[in-house]
Protein backbone atom coordinates (compact mmCIF):
# COMPACT_ATOMS: atom_id res chain seq x y z
CA UNK A 1 0.00 0.00 0.00
CA UNK A 2 1.57 3.29 -1.17
CA UNK A 3 0.21 6.01 1.10
CA UNK A 4 1.18 9.62 0.36
CA UNK A 5 0.38 12.35 2.88
CA UNK A 6 0.47 16.01 1.90
CA UNK A 7 1.03 18.04 5.05
CA UNK A 8 3.00 17.03 8.13
CA UNK A 9 0.89 18.49 10.92
CA UNK A 10 -0.93 16.57 13.68
CA UNK A 11 -3.29 14.84 11.21
CA UNK A 12 -0.56 13.86 8.76
CA UNK A 13 1.95 12.76 11.39
CA UNK A 14 -0.54 10.60 13.25
CA UNK A 15 -1.84 9.02 10.05
CA UNK A 16 1.74 8.31 8.97
CA UNK A 17 2.86 6.62 12.19
CA UNK A 18 -0.27 4.46 12.49
CA UNK A 19 -0.27 3.45 8.82
CA UNK A 20 3.45 2.66 8.87
CA UNK A 21 3.01 0.41 11.91
CA UNK A 22 0.25 -1.39 10.03
CA UNK A 23 2.52 -2.05 7.06
CA UNK A 24 1.94 0.80 4.62
CA UNK A 25 4.73 2.46 2.62
CA UNK A 26 4.25 6.02 3.80
CA UNK A 27 5.59 9.27 2.36
CA UNK A 28 4.96 12.71 3.87
CA UNK A 29 5.38 15.82 1.74
CA UNK A 30 5.71 18.96 3.88
CA UNK A 31 6.15 22.49 2.56
CA UNK A 32 7.02 24.35 5.76
CA UNK A 33 7.89 22.44 8.92
CA UNK A 34 7.50 18.84 10.10
CA UNK A 35 5.01 19.09 12.93
CA UNK A 36 2.76 21.51 11.08
CA UNK A 37 2.91 25.27 10.57
CA UNK A 38 -0.34 25.99 12.42
CA UNK A 39 0.82 23.74 15.27
CA UNK A 40 4.46 24.84 15.62
CA UNK A 41 4.14 28.41 14.32
CA UNK A 42 0.80 29.27 15.96
CA UNK A 43 -0.46 26.95 18.69
CA UNK A 44 2.73 26.07 20.54
CA UNK A 45 4.28 29.58 20.48
CA UNK A 46 1.02 31.21 21.56
CA UNK A 47 0.53 28.81 24.45
CA UNK A 48 4.18 29.30 25.45
CA UNK A 49 3.70 33.06 25.59
CA UNK A 50 0.40 32.64 27.41
CA UNK A 51 2.13 30.46 30.01
CA UNK A 52 4.80 33.13 30.52
CA UNK A 53 2.16 35.84 30.72
CA UNK A 54 0.19 33.72 33.18
CA UNK A 55 3.27 33.39 35.37
CA UNK A 56 3.61 37.18 35.38
CA UNK A 57 -0.06 37.60 36.22
CA UNK A 58 0.20 35.09 39.06
CA UNK A 59 3.29 36.85 40.40
CA UNK A 60 1.28 40.05 40.67
CA UNK A 61 -1.25 38.23 42.87
CA UNK A 62 1.14 36.52 45.29
CA UNK A 63 0.63 39.21 47.92
CA UNK A 64 -2.60 37.39 48.73
CA UNK A 65 -0.60 34.28 49.65
CA UNK A 66 1.46 35.84 52.41
CA UNK A 67 4.29 36.95 50.09
CA UNK A 68 5.70 40.32 49.14
CA UNK A 69 4.26 41.92 46.01
CA UNK A 70 6.26 41.09 42.86
CA UNK A 71 6.39 43.05 39.61
CA UNK A 72 8.14 40.90 36.99
CA UNK A 73 9.14 42.29 33.60
CA UNK A 74 9.36 40.57 30.23
CA UNK A 75 12.77 39.35 29.07
CA UNK A 76 11.99 39.42 25.35
CA UNK A 77 15.18 37.67 24.27
CA UNK A 78 14.67 35.01 26.92
CA UNK A 79 11.07 34.56 25.80
CA UNK A 80 12.11 34.16 22.16
CA UNK A 81 14.73 31.60 23.18
CA UNK A 82 12.15 29.69 25.20
CA UNK A 83 9.70 29.61 22.28
CA UNK A 84 12.33 28.50 19.78
CA UNK A 85 13.63 25.85 22.16
CA UNK A 86 10.20 24.27 22.60
CA UNK A 87 9.48 24.40 18.85
CA UNK A 88 12.83 22.81 18.05
CA UNK A 89 12.35 20.05 20.60
CA UNK A 90 8.89 19.18 19.31
CA UNK A 91 9.96 19.28 15.66
CA UNK A 92 12.95 17.02 16.31
CA UNK A 93 10.93 14.54 18.36
CA UNK A 94 8.25 14.36 15.65
CA UNK A 95 10.85 13.88 12.91
CA UNK A 96 12.64 11.19 14.92
CA UNK A 97 9.39 9.31 15.53
CA UNK A 98 8.44 9.36 11.84
CA UNK A 99 11.88 8.23 10.72
CA UNK A 100 11.87 5.43 13.29
CA UNK A 101 8.66 4.13 11.68
CA UNK A 102 10.25 4.13 8.23
CA UNK A 103 8.24 7.11 6.96
CA UNK A 104 9.86 8.90 4.01
CA UNK A 105 9.97 12.68 4.50
CA UNK A 106 10.14 15.03 1.52
CA UNK A 107 10.45 18.79 1.94
CA UNK A 108 8.69 20.51 -0.93
CA UNK A 109 5.46 21.72 -2.50
CA UNK A 110 3.05 19.03 -3.68
CA UNK A 111 0.54 19.30 -6.50
CA UNK A 112 -1.81 16.58 -7.70
CA UNK A 113 -1.50 15.75 -11.40
CA UNK A 114 -4.07 12.97 -11.51
CA UNK A 115 -6.18 10.66 -9.36
CA UNK A 116 -3.14 8.55 -8.40
CA UNK A 117 -0.17 10.86 -8.91
CA UNK A 118 1.37 14.11 -7.76
CA UNK A 119 4.54 16.11 -8.28
CA UNK A 120 6.73 17.63 -5.59
CA UNK A 121 8.81 20.74 -6.20
CA UNK A 122 11.90 20.45 -4.00
CA UNK A 123 15.11 22.42 -3.71
CA UNK A 124 16.75 19.79 -5.92
CA UNK A 125 14.07 19.73 -8.62
CA UNK A 126 10.79 18.02 -9.42
CA UNK A 127 9.88 14.58 -8.11
CA UNK A 128 6.92 12.47 -9.20
CA UNK A 129 5.06 10.24 -6.77
CA UNK A 130 2.41 7.62 -7.40
CA UNK A 131 0.05 6.46 -4.69
CA UNK A 132 -2.71 4.01 -3.90
CA UNK A 133 -4.18 6.28 -1.22
CA UNK A 134 -3.51 9.89 -0.32
CA UNK A 135 -4.30 12.21 2.57
CA UNK A 136 -4.67 15.97 2.23
CA UNK A 137 -3.78 17.55 5.58
CA UNK A 138 -2.28 20.89 4.59
CA UNK A 139 -3.76 22.91 7.44
CA UNK A 140 -4.77 26.55 7.35
CA UNK A 141 -3.42 30.08 7.53
CA UNK A 142 -4.72 33.28 9.16
CA UNK A 143 -7.58 34.92 7.31
CA UNK A 144 -6.81 38.43 6.06
CA UNK A 145 -9.73 40.60 4.84
CA UNK A 146 -9.33 42.73 1.75
CA UNK A 147 -9.46 45.95 3.81
CA UNK A 148 -6.32 45.14 5.78
CA UNK A 149 -2.68 44.82 4.75
CA UNK A 150 -0.53 43.22 7.48
CA UNK A 151 3.09 44.33 7.46
CA UNK A 152 4.47 41.93 10.08
CA UNK A 153 5.62 44.87 12.18
CA UNK A 154 2.70 46.92 13.48
CA UNK A 155 -0.26 45.38 11.65
CA UNK A 156 -0.08 41.71 12.54
CA UNK A 157 -1.72 38.41 11.79
CA UNK A 158 -1.72 35.92 14.63
CA UNK A 159 1.30 34.23 13.06
CA UNK A 160 3.37 37.43 13.42
CA UNK A 161 2.97 37.64 17.20
CA UNK A 162 5.40 35.13 18.71
CA UNK A 163 6.57 37.64 19.75
CA UNK A 164 6.20 40.67 17.43
CA UNK A 165 9.32 42.51 16.24
CA UNK A 166 8.62 45.33 18.67
CA UNK A 167 6.80 44.54 21.88
CA UNK A 168 3.51 46.48 22.01
CA UNK A 169 2.87 49.26 24.47
CA UNK A 170 -0.73 49.12 23.36
CA UNK A 171 -2.55 46.72 21.07
CA UNK A 172 -5.97 46.46 19.49
CA UNK A 173 -7.21 42.94 18.86
CA UNK A 174 -9.76 42.55 16.08
CA UNK A 175 -11.88 39.46 16.66
CA UNK A 176 -13.40 38.24 19.92
CA UNK A 177 -13.45 34.52 19.25
CA UNK A 178 -11.17 31.94 20.83
CA UNK A 179 -7.94 33.24 19.30
CA UNK A 180 -8.80 36.88 19.89
CA UNK A 181 -9.50 36.53 23.60
CA UNK A 182 -6.31 34.51 24.08
CA UNK A 183 -4.33 37.40 22.60
CA UNK A 184 -6.12 39.87 24.85
CA UNK A 185 -5.15 37.77 27.86
CA UNK A 186 -1.58 37.34 26.65
CA UNK A 187 -0.76 40.97 25.88
CA UNK A 188 -2.58 42.34 28.93
CA UNK A 189 -0.56 39.92 31.10
CA UNK A 190 2.60 41.40 29.60
CA UNK A 191 1.44 44.87 30.62
CA UNK A 192 0.18 46.25 27.31
CA UNK A 193 -2.91 48.44 27.13
CA UNK A 194 -5.41 46.31 25.20
CA UNK A 195 -8.55 47.15 23.25
CA UNK A 196 -10.78 44.37 21.92
CA UNK A 197 -13.11 45.01 18.99
CA UNK A 198 -16.19 42.87 19.67
CA UNK A 199 -18.62 42.60 16.75
CA UNK A 200 -21.39 41.16 18.96
CA UNK A 201 -22.61 42.12 22.43
CA UNK A 202 -20.41 39.57 24.24
CA UNK A 203 -16.97 38.10 23.76
CA UNK A 204 -16.93 34.46 22.61
CA UNK A 205 -20.31 34.77 20.87
CA UNK A 206 -20.56 31.01 20.38
CA UNK A 207 -20.07 30.19 24.05
CA UNK A 208 -22.30 30.04 27.12
CA UNK A 209 -23.15 33.63 28.20
CA UNK A 210 -22.22 32.76 31.81
CA UNK A 211 -18.79 31.70 30.59
CA UNK A 212 -18.34 34.86 28.55
CA UNK A 213 -19.43 37.00 31.51
CA UNK A 214 -16.66 35.63 33.75
CA UNK A 215 -14.05 36.35 31.09
CA UNK A 216 -15.37 39.84 30.43
CA UNK A 217 -15.24 40.58 34.16
CA UNK A 218 -11.57 39.58 34.23
CA UNK A 219 -10.80 41.67 31.14
CA UNK A 220 -12.42 44.75 32.64
CA UNK A 221 -10.54 44.21 35.91
CA UNK A 222 -7.32 44.22 33.88
CA UNK A 223 -8.27 47.50 32.24
CA UNK A 224 -9.08 46.01 28.85
CA UNK A 225 -11.29 48.26 26.74
CA UNK A 226 -14.17 46.43 25.04
CA UNK A 227 -15.66 47.98 21.88
CA UNK A 228 -18.91 46.03 21.64
CA UNK A 229 -21.16 46.01 18.61
CA UNK A 230 -18.38 47.29 16.36
CA UNK A 231 -16.83 45.81 13.23
CA UNK A 232 -13.42 46.93 12.06
CA UNK A 233 -13.47 48.28 8.50
CA UNK A 234 -9.88 49.47 8.10
CA UNK A 235 -6.50 49.30 9.80
CA UNK A 236 -3.91 51.85 8.73
CA UNK A 237 -0.39 52.56 9.89
CA UNK A 238 0.54 56.19 10.35
CA UNK A 239 3.12 58.47 11.97
CA UNK A 240 2.51 61.81 13.66
CA UNK A 241 4.18 64.01 16.24
CA UNK A 242 1.70 63.22 19.00
CA UNK A 243 1.53 59.43 18.75
CA UNK A 244 4.63 58.50 16.77
CA UNK A 245 4.51 55.30 14.72
CA UNK A 246 1.12 53.70 15.39
CA UNK A 247 -1.99 52.17 13.83
CA UNK A 248 -5.53 53.49 13.54
CA UNK A 249 -8.43 51.04 13.52
CA UNK A 250 -11.72 52.36 12.13
CA UNK A 251 -15.07 50.69 12.86
CA UNK A 252 -18.37 50.66 11.01
CA UNK A 253 -20.10 52.73 13.71
CA UNK A 254 -17.65 55.61 13.38
CA UNK A 255 -15.48 54.77 16.39
CA UNK A 256 -11.71 54.69 15.98
CA UNK A 257 -8.90 53.28 18.10
CA UNK A 258 -5.22 54.20 18.13
CA UNK A 259 -2.61 51.76 19.39
CA UNK A 260 1.00 50.85 18.78
CA UNK A 261 -0.04 47.52 17.22
CA UNK A 262 -3.10 45.78 15.81
CA UNK A 263 -3.69 42.03 15.67
CA UNK A 264 -6.09 40.33 13.27
CA UNK A 265 -7.74 37.32 14.90
CA UNK A 266 -10.70 36.69 12.62
CA UNK A 267 -10.29 33.05 11.79
CA UNK A 268 -8.37 31.06 9.21
CA UNK A 269 -8.65 29.77 5.66
CA UNK A 270 -7.64 26.32 4.40
CA UNK A 271 -4.44 25.75 2.42
CA UNK A 272 -6.01 24.13 -0.64
CA UNK A 273 -5.76 26.76 -3.36
CA UNK A 274 -2.61 25.45 -5.12
CA UNK A 275 -2.81 21.69 -4.53
CA UNK A 276 -4.25 20.79 -7.93
CA UNK A 277 -7.12 18.93 -6.30
CA UNK A 278 -9.19 19.35 -9.44
CA UNK A 279 -6.71 17.14 -11.31
CA UNK A 280 -7.39 14.39 -8.78
CA UNK A 281 -11.13 14.93 -9.04
CA UNK A 282 -11.43 16.03 -5.41
CA UNK A 283 -14.29 18.39 -4.68
CA UNK A 284 -13.72 21.61 -2.73
CA UNK A 285 -16.52 23.74 -1.27
CA UNK A 286 -16.97 27.49 -1.64
CA UNK A 287 -14.78 28.17 1.39
CA UNK A 288 -11.89 26.08 0.09
CA UNK A 289 -12.54 23.19 2.47
CA UNK A 290 -12.57 19.55 1.38
CA UNK A 291 -15.87 17.83 2.32
CA UNK A 292 -15.46 14.40 3.95
CA UNK A 293 -17.61 11.55 5.26
CA UNK A 294 -17.42 9.82 8.64
CA UNK A 295 -14.20 8.06 7.57
CA UNK A 296 -12.57 11.33 6.40
CA UNK A 297 -12.97 10.14 2.80
CA UNK A 298 -13.48 12.78 0.10
CA UNK A 299 -15.64 12.27 -2.98
CA UNK A 300 -12.73 10.17 -4.28
CA UNK A 301 -12.78 6.86 -2.35
CA UNK A 302 -8.97 6.60 -2.11
CA UNK A 303 -8.26 10.24 -1.17
CA UNK A 304 -8.79 11.51 2.37
CA UNK A 305 -8.76 14.90 4.07
CA UNK A 306 -8.12 15.68 7.73
CA UNK A 307 -7.27 18.57 9.99
CA UNK A 308 -8.24 22.16 9.25
CA UNK A 309 -8.77 21.54 5.52
CA UNK A 310 -11.67 19.19 6.32
CA UNK A 311 -13.76 22.03 7.73
CA UNK A 312 -14.35 20.21 11.01
CA UNK A 313 -13.30 21.47 14.44
CA UNK A 314 -9.93 23.25 14.00
CA UNK A 315 -8.27 21.51 16.95
CA UNK A 316 -4.97 19.61 16.99
CA UNK A 317 -6.61 16.87 19.05
CA UNK A 318 -9.33 16.43 16.44
CA UNK A 319 -6.79 16.46 13.60
CA UNK A 320 -4.69 13.78 15.30
CA UNK A 321 -7.74 11.59 15.89
CA UNK A 322 -8.80 12.05 12.27
CA UNK A 323 -5.31 10.98 11.23
CA UNK A 324 -5.59 7.77 13.22
CA UNK A 325 -9.03 7.02 11.77
CA UNK A 326 -7.68 7.62 8.26
CA UNK A 327 -4.81 5.18 8.82
CA UNK A 328 -7.23 2.54 10.10
CA UNK A 329 -9.50 3.03 7.09
CA UNK A 330 -6.63 2.97 4.60
CA UNK A 331 -5.46 -0.35 6.04
CA UNK A 332 -8.96 -1.84 6.19
CA UNK A 333 -9.45 -1.86 9.96
CA UNK A 334 -12.80 -0.07 9.67
CA UNK A 335 -14.37 -3.40 8.75
CA UNK A 336 -13.85 -4.51 12.36
CA UNK A 337 -15.56 -3.12 15.45
CA UNK A 338 -14.98 0.57 14.97
CA UNK A 339 -15.97 3.80 16.74
CA UNK A 340 -16.53 6.74 14.44
CA UNK A 341 -15.12 10.10 15.42
CA UNK A 342 -17.89 12.07 17.14
CA UNK A 343 -17.06 15.75 16.74
CA UNK A 344 -19.84 16.73 19.15
CA UNK A 345 -17.90 15.04 21.96
CA UNK A 346 -14.58 16.81 21.36
CA UNK A 347 -13.29 18.78 24.33
CA UNK A 348 -11.92 22.25 23.70
CA UNK A 349 -10.19 24.86 25.82
CA UNK A 350 -9.41 28.55 25.73
CA UNK A 351 -6.19 29.50 27.47
CA UNK A 352 -7.22 32.77 29.01
CA UNK A 353 -7.24 33.67 32.69
CA UNK A 354 -9.34 32.11 33.98
CA UNK A 355 -9.15 29.16 31.59
CA UNK A 356 -12.31 28.07 29.80
CA UNK A 357 -13.12 24.53 28.68
CA UNK A 358 -16.19 22.70 27.47
CA UNK A 359 -17.31 19.43 25.95
CA UNK A 360 -20.47 17.86 24.61
CA UNK A 361 -23.95 19.35 24.67
CA UNK A 362 -24.22 23.03 25.54
CA UNK A 363 -27.11 24.46 27.52
CA UNK A 364 -28.17 26.77 24.69
CA UNK A 365 -28.09 23.93 22.17
CA UNK A 366 -30.42 21.85 24.31
CA UNK A 367 -32.87 24.72 24.75
CA UNK A 368 -32.81 25.43 21.00
CA UNK A 369 -34.11 21.94 20.20
CA UNK A 370 -36.39 21.67 23.23
CA UNK A 371 -34.40 18.90 24.87
CA UNK A 372 -34.91 18.41 28.59
CA UNK A 373 -31.68 18.59 30.57
CA UNK A 374 -30.49 18.81 34.15
CA UNK A 375 -27.99 21.60 34.78
CA UNK A 376 -25.92 21.71 37.95
CA UNK A 377 -23.37 24.39 38.72
CA UNK A 378 -20.84 24.78 41.52
CA UNK A 379 -18.55 27.81 42.00
CA UNK A 380 -14.87 27.23 42.72
CA UNK A 381 -15.27 29.58 45.69
CA UNK A 382 -16.84 26.58 47.47
CA UNK A 383 -13.75 24.43 46.83
CA UNK A 384 -10.96 24.50 49.46
CA UNK A 385 -8.13 24.08 46.93
CA UNK A 386 -9.28 27.15 44.99
CA UNK A 387 -9.05 29.21 48.17
CA UNK A 388 -5.62 27.74 48.91
CA UNK A 389 -4.53 28.75 45.39
CA UNK A 390 -5.81 32.29 46.00
CA UNK A 391 -7.88 31.97 42.84
CA UNK A 392 -11.56 31.16 43.33
CA UNK A 393 -12.81 32.54 40.03
CA UNK A 394 -15.14 30.49 37.89
CA UNK A 395 -17.33 27.43 38.18
CA UNK A 396 -18.07 23.89 37.04
CA UNK A 397 -21.28 23.21 35.15
CA UNK A 398 -22.45 19.70 34.27
CA UNK A 399 -25.31 18.94 31.89
CA UNK A 400 -27.00 15.56 32.16
CA UNK A 401 -30.12 13.69 31.09
CA UNK A 402 -32.74 14.10 33.87
CA UNK A 403 -34.22 10.67 33.21
CA UNK A 404 -31.08 8.54 32.95
CA UNK A 405 -28.40 10.61 34.66
CA UNK A 406 -26.09 10.21 31.65
CA UNK A 407 -23.57 13.05 31.36
CA UNK A 408 -24.23 14.99 28.15
CA UNK A 409 -21.74 17.84 28.48
CA UNK A 410 -20.21 20.44 30.69
CA UNK A 411 -18.32 23.70 31.00
CA UNK A 412 -15.53 24.73 33.34
CA UNK A 413 -14.24 28.23 33.94
CA UNK A 414 -11.30 28.55 36.27
CA UNK A 415 -7.75 27.56 36.99
CA UNK A 416 -6.66 24.36 35.18
CA UNK A 417 -10.01 24.09 33.39
CA UNK A 418 -8.23 22.61 30.35
CA UNK A 419 -7.04 19.71 32.50
CA UNK A 420 -10.21 19.23 34.54
CA UNK A 421 -12.48 19.04 31.48
CA UNK A 422 -10.94 15.64 30.69
CA UNK A 423 -13.04 14.08 33.45
CA UNK A 424 -16.27 15.32 31.88
CA UNK A 425 -15.01 14.48 28.38
CA UNK A 426 -14.39 10.88 29.42
CA UNK A 427 -17.85 10.71 30.98
CA UNK A 428 -19.46 12.05 27.80
CA UNK A 429 -17.53 9.68 25.52
CA UNK A 430 -18.16 6.61 27.68
CA UNK A 431 -21.83 7.48 28.40
CA UNK A 432 -21.15 7.56 32.14
CA UNK A 433 -23.71 8.82 34.61
CA UNK A 434 -23.37 11.64 37.10
CA UNK A 435 -23.48 8.95 39.78
CA UNK A 436 -20.25 7.50 38.37
CA UNK A 437 -18.51 10.80 39.04
CA UNK A 438 -20.10 11.15 42.47
CA UNK A 439 -18.97 7.65 43.47
CA UNK A 440 -15.36 8.32 42.41
CA UNK A 441 -12.93 8.79 45.30
CA UNK A 442 -10.88 11.83 44.32
CA UNK A 443 -7.99 13.62 46.00
CA UNK A 444 -8.60 16.16 48.74
CA UNK A 445 -7.92 19.02 48.61
CA UNK A 446 -8.12 19.31 44.82
CA UNK A 447 -9.94 21.44 42.28
CA UNK A 448 -11.45 18.23 40.87
CA UNK A 449 -13.67 18.03 43.96
CA UNK A 450 -15.82 20.68 42.30
CA UNK A 451 -16.65 18.10 39.63
CA UNK A 452 -18.07 15.75 42.23
CA UNK A 453 -20.03 18.57 43.85
CA UNK A 454 -21.46 19.60 40.48
CA UNK A 455 -22.37 16.01 39.64
CA UNK A 456 -24.37 15.74 42.87
Label each residue range with its predicted role.
Residues 152-167, 256-335:
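FAD-site-proximal beta/loop scaffold in flavoenzymes
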Residues 17-24, 29-167, 200-204, 209-211, ...:
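Glycine-rich flavin
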Residues 70, 104-107, 111-122, 129, ...:
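A Rossmann-like FAD-binding core segment of flavoenzymes
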Residues 1-3:
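Extreme N-terminal starter segment of soluble prokaryotic enzymes
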Residues 12, 177-180, 319:
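Catalytic nucleophile loop
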Residues 6-32, 37, 44, 48-55, ...:
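Flexible, glycine-rich terminal cap/loop adjacent to redox cofactors
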Residues 43, 138-197, 278-280, 284-295, ...:
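Glycine-rich dinucleotide-binding loop and its adjacent helix/turn
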Amino acid sequence: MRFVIVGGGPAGNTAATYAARLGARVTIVERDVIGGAAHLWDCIPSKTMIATGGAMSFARRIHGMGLEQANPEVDVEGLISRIEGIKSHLQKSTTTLLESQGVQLIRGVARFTGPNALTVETAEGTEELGFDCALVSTGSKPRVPDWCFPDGDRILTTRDCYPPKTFPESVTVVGSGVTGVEFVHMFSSFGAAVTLVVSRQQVLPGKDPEVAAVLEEDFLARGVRLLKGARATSIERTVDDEHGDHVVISCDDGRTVRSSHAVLAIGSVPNTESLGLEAAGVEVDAGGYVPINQHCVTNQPHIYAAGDVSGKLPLSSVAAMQGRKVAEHVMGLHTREHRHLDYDKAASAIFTEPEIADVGLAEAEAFAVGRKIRVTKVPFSATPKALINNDSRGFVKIISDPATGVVLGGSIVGRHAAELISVIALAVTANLKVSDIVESLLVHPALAEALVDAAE
